[in-house]
Amino acid sequence: EKHWRTYAFEYLLREEEFKIQARELLTAYHQYIQDHPPQVVARERKFSFTIDELQVMISGKIDRIDQEGDRLAVVDYKTSKNKEKAKGSLQLALYTEALKRDAVEGVSGKPGSTILHFLRHPDDPLESHVFDTADLDKQMEKVTAVSAGIRKYEFPTKPGDFICRNCDYREFLCPAWEEN
């Protein structure tokens, strides 16, 4: 209760709905942790590393790092309703790369599994993957492509109902929306 931010909500009814959902998610998560206690090494840990050949700095924050045998597991919490695969996650690949490079503040060890913990799926909350060298190389190709696009000021639109539905420019300025 003391950390709840009432001012973040425009409408009282919406705040009450979110508060109920938050309580349900936290209750289910607490039960899951009681049933499956992790060996937590760190929480909310910053990392930063440079990909020299691209002159690109990657930085971020890892939600949780656990000890799993002689390896470190990265856990990223998700509140989305839809589950996604850990295998194709660029985010998790970059977390693995940060551990490989010893770039996580106050944490060192060999990377192991990466885990997406879906809080809205208490019966089956985890989606995990261990990134091997080939997986990491594939994900780093994405970083290379994105950084090249940024340097060329190329930001291609990706129109779609989910992305575009709240866009103020959709109806009168967006040629990509018109084509779609």
Predicted feature locations:
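Glycine- and acidic
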Residues: 3-13, 73-82, 127-128, 153
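Metal-dependent nuclease catalytic regions and adjoining charged, substrate-binding loops involved
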Residues: 100-180
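Short, well-ordered loop/turn elements at secondary-structure boundaries
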Residues: 36-37, 60-61, 67-69, 110, ...
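Residue-level signal for well-ordered alpha-helical scaffold segments within enzymatic catalytic domains
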Residues: 24, 28, 93-97, 145
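Non-catalytic protein-protein interaction segments used by genome-maintenance enzymes to assemble
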Residues: 42-103, 142
